């Protein structure tokens, strides 16, 4: 078994808890931002955050047996901004005064994990989602081994298959997502505090394309089309054969055809265009990366850069428990 961490999720989750200790209830937002700036620049407080990151990291890994490799992926500026200027605008238009210090601390965490020998994957133009997908292909199709992705990003559920599962180690709820056929197996594998849920990964993708996502600035295909309507749509198209090895346009046509029939829409071209846009923004599939073959500074496409990153890092670490001793964790020194 191999494990991939969504590094941004892991960092944000831990940071949100750590940051509460350095804010005051009666302070203004501006005052609390300044307090966070000071905390992120303080060497001792940086060490507290780094130790917490390592402890949470180990706690997640130690729930699994016979782990071979552990990788961590971290975001860079997304290629999707070239596609849509306002991509994730709602999330990025306001950045706290501590933003640069936050990124600096993320870089410190990244460098520390690299020094410890873990695979740390970061590619210009690629979001963590993109790298999670590319690494999942390597672990499951090249090595033909099981993979668990540790993340709180529900979008990643669209790549779940018989060999890929998802573990959400939220501080409030521990959830594990897998194909329905492996629910019993994983239920017996875990302690009782982990909730196991079987999901249909293809329908996860359909939901995002049809229902949209305001956090990613992805519009809904039809106003007033709610969850109840989506469930009826799934019933309407069932039974269906999931399209395999198709282009972005072919997948968009498959969805648009059925959506227009279900809604009795006559605006097929408009619906098709919107489905195509939504697919390009959300679908984790090689077809997307091939179709939009953006060139980067080194003259290579994003896909080639991601594949090169896998080839460069795939052999860098063989995981043997425990990854860190207590001395490693509490001796983590930020210079």
Label the predicted regions.
Residues 1-114:
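Domain-level signal for Mg2+-assisted phosphodiester chemistry and nucleotide/NA-binding surfaces
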Residues 67, 93-332:
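Extended two-metal-dependent nuclease catalytic cores across DNA- and RNA-processing enzymes
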């Amino acid at each position: 078994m191999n494990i991939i961490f969504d590094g941004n999720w892991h960092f944000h989750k831990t940071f949100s808890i750590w940051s509460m200790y350095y804010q005051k209830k009666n302070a203004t937002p501006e005052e609390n931002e300044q307090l966070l700036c000071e905390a992120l620049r303080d060497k001792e407080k940086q060490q507290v955050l780094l130790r917490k990151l390592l402890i949470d990291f180990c706690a997640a890994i130690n729930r699994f047996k016979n782990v071979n490799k552990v990788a961590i992926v971290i975001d860079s500026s997304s290629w999707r901004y070239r596609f849509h200027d306002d991509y994730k605008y709602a999330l990025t238009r306001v950045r706290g005064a501590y933003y640069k210090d936050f990124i600096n601390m993320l870089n410190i965490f990244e460098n520390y994990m690299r020094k410890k020998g873990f695979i740390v994957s970061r590619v210009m133009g690629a979001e963590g989602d993109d790298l999670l997908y590319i690494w999942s292909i390597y672990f499951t199709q090249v090595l033909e081994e099981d993979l668990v992705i540790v993340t709180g990003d529900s979008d990643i559920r669209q790549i779940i298959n018989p060999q890929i599962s998802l573990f959400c180690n939220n501080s409030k709820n521990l959830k594990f997502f897998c194909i329905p056929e492996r629910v019993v197996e994983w239920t017996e594998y875990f302690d009782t505090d982990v909730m196991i849920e079987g999901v249909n990964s293809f329908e996860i993708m359909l939901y995002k394309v049809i229902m949209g996502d305001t956090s990613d600035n992805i519009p809904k295909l039809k106003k007033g089309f709610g969850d109840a309507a989506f469930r009826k749509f799934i019933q309407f198209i069932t039974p269906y054969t999931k399209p395999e090895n198709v282009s972005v346009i072919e997948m968009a046509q498959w969805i648009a055809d059925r959506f227009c029939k279900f809604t009795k829409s006559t605006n097929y071209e408009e619906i098709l265009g919107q489905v195509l846009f939504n697919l390009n923004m959300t679908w984790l599939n090689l077809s997307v990366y091939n179709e939009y073959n953006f060139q980067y500074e080194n003259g290579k496409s994003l896909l080639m850069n991601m594949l090169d990153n896998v080839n460069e890092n795939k052999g860098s670490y063989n995981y043997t428990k425990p990854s860190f001793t207590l001395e490693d964790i509490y001796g983590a020194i930020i210079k």
